Amino acid sequence: VMFSSGAMKSKVDLLDASRMLFAKGYQIYATAGTAAFLNAHGVDATPVYWPDEKPGAENNVMKMIADHKFDLIVNIPKNHSKRELTNGYRIRRGAIDHNIPLITNARLASAFIEAFCELKLSDIQIKSWQEYK
């Protein structure tokens, strides 16, 4: 799972979710600022380079996306600077182009990850579409 969580509020909002994934044994990757935050709060996160940093490096996020190293990408925009928008766009576009699930909202990401980590298949009752109407 790769996190690029943007502003401090988003980092805090995603902390419990990233802890859950880490506790379940998932490998956590994150862009530099997010990785530093997660590591400082007990989540072992491997830093990855932004798209415009060291493009040929093994741990450049775009190379890792192309190599399908992530099963989920959580990318929360931080600000509207040209660099931030371009890098964020490239990550989101790469996720879509390589069929990697992408979440761009911190609250939605937290809810999804909590459900993913806490619910078992036996907890979910499968119904036909008509039963939901």
What feature does the model see in each segment?
Residues 117-124, 130:
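Intrinsically disordered, low-complexity linkers and terminal regions
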Residues 1-101, 109-112, 126-133:
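ATP-dependent carboxylate/acyl-activation modules
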Residues 106-120:
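Structured adenosyl-cofactor binding patch, chiefly the S-adenosyl-L-methionine
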